Amino acid sequence: MAKGQSLQDPFLNALRRERVPVSIYLVNGIKLQGQVESFDQFVILLKNTVSQMVYKHAISTVVPARALHITPTQSSQPGYVQHDDAPAE
């Protein structure tokens, strides 16, 4: 798996598993809202009143409605880096 997906998959999987509402902004500025139903290497299936298949190359930003905490055990990918929310002292 590509190095760039070492954070992407655990993030999307946590959104899917916890059914967190998300706003997805496309590169053309359109805002989509719903819940991540499924995803693969190329698309995200977004469910609201209908299901939409959104190609990842068209996505600019994914904004969860609430904070997520992704633990290292949720990612078996090498190179996965967890950033703590606590400020450095």
Swiss-Prot record:
Cited Pfam families: Hfq (PF17209)
PANTHER family per UniProt: RNA-BINDING PROTEIN HFQ
Every Sm domain range: 9-68
Family according to the record: Belongs to the Hfq family.
Main function: RNA chaperone that binds small regulatory RNA (sRNAs) and mRNAs to facilitate mRNA translational regulation in response to envelope stress, environmental stress and changes in metabolite concentrations. Also binds with high specificity to tRNAs.
CDD domains cross-referenced by the UniProt entry: Hfq (cd01716)
UniProt KW keywords: RNA-binding, Stress response
Gene3D superfamilies: 2.30.30.100
Organism, scientific name: Shewanella denitrificans (strain OS217 / ATCC BAA-1090 / DSM 15013)
Description of how the protein assembles with itself and partners: Homohexamer.
A GO term for molecular function: RNA binding
GO annotation (BP), single: regulation of translation, ncRNA-mediated
RNA-binding is among the record's keywords: yes
Record-given protein name: RNA-binding protein Hfq
SUPFAM superfamilies, per the entry: Sm-like ribonucleoproteins
